[in-house]
A protein has these predicted regions:
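Noncatalytic, basic helical substrate-engagement surface that gates or grips nucleic-acid strands
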Residues: 1-114, 118-145, 223-239
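Non-catalytic nucleic-acid-binding/docking modules located in mid-to-C-terminal regions
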Residues: 35-38, 127, 142-301
């Protein structure tokens, strides 16, 4: 595992995320051998979500400065490695991924979504799988491939009911409040008994435990709003285009520039290139200028 405190020796620019990002991309490409590979970035803000819930994701901590500094370089490296980059201001990367999956599967392609986000379970089925990364707390578990059975076993409801489930329990990571006191077990039980969110709302007079009935009556419209928030929108423009070619010389130059020497040597060996001599390093002062606004999140697809 790459250390998060790695830095370029000449000016102490952080490179830990770059090391980990490159390793993940290359490992995934080697293990999955896809026909094409796209990476989706958030450019900040989601117009459709904020229109329903102005507090959407408002509780999230600021991205660590070291990560913000590396994001422009992460994007540059991603392109050099031959991965398509997809992003659109005002549209969440999750919606762009769901749109791409919808378009590609409709034309007969198989898709793998690489993400730990449980929301993507609603896309799984038919030609779509979800590949989740190793848990931070237990990396020995490795990457896990989730089909319909896997998603159902993990969440407790099938993919087509995950949005109903999330509308009821809420999503703390996105600042979406569910019904107060309703946890996973209760939501799964209600959905199994009543067939989905609208069935639950319609059965308010017989819902058990009885203490939830008044809350359901008074908050039904808000919970329906939750459903809009957690259901992916799949009608955004998306064109697969041509798969970019890997720029081996460009990657070698990039790794040299970032002083990622061990990664550079491995990459040169992999591509049959002569190893470059290590440059002499003259330390420079670290720039204190504010980093440019860049995407805060990347998802692999």
């Amino acid at each position: 595992m790459e250390r998060s405190n790695l830095r370029r020796q000449s000016d102490q620019f952080p490179t830990g995320a770059l090391h980990g990002w490159m390793k993940s991309l290359l490992d995934l490409r080697e293990s999955e051998k896809p026909d094409r590979f796209a990476v989706f970035f958030d450019l900040g803000g989601s117009d459709r979500h904020l229109a329903v819930l102005p507090e959407y994701k408002a509780q999230r901590d600021e991205t660590p400065e070291d990560i913000v500094l590396q994001l422009p370089e992460i994007k540059r490296l991603t392109g050099l490695l031959g991965f398509q980059i997809v992003e659109k201001r005002g549209v969440e990367a999750d919606d762009l991924i769901a749109t791409a999956v919808h378009r590609l599967t409709a034309s007969g392609h198989e898709c793998i979504i690489v993400s730990a986000d449980k929301d993507f379970g609603q896309c799984v089925g038919g030609k779509v799988l979800q590949l989740t990364p190793p848990p931070t707390a237990n990396p020995a578990l490795g990457w896990r491939r989730m089909d319909v059975a896997g998603v159902t076993a993990k969440i407790g409801v099938p993919p087509e009911r995950i949005a109903d489930y999330l509308a009821l329990v809420g999503d703390a990571s996105d600042n979406i409040p569910g019904l107060r006191g309703v946890g996973p077990k209760t939501a799964v039980k209600w959905i199994a008994e009543h067939g989905g969110l609208e069935g639950v709302l319609a059965a308010v007079e017989s819902i058990q435990p009885e203490r939830f009935r008044e809350q359901i009556r008074t908050e039904a419209d808000r919970i329906r709003g939750n459903l809009k928030l957690v259901t992916f929108q799949t009608d955004f423009p998306f064109e697969p285009g041509d798969q970019p070619a890997e720029d081996v010389d460009g990657v070698i130059d990039f790794l040299g520039e970032m002083e990622m020497h061990s990664t550079l040597r491995r990459y040169q060996v992999k591509h049959g290139r002569k190893e470059s001599p290590l440059p002499s390093v003259v330390p420079k002062a670290v720039s204190k200028s504010s980093p440019p606004a860049e995407p805060r999140q990347g998802e692999l697809f």
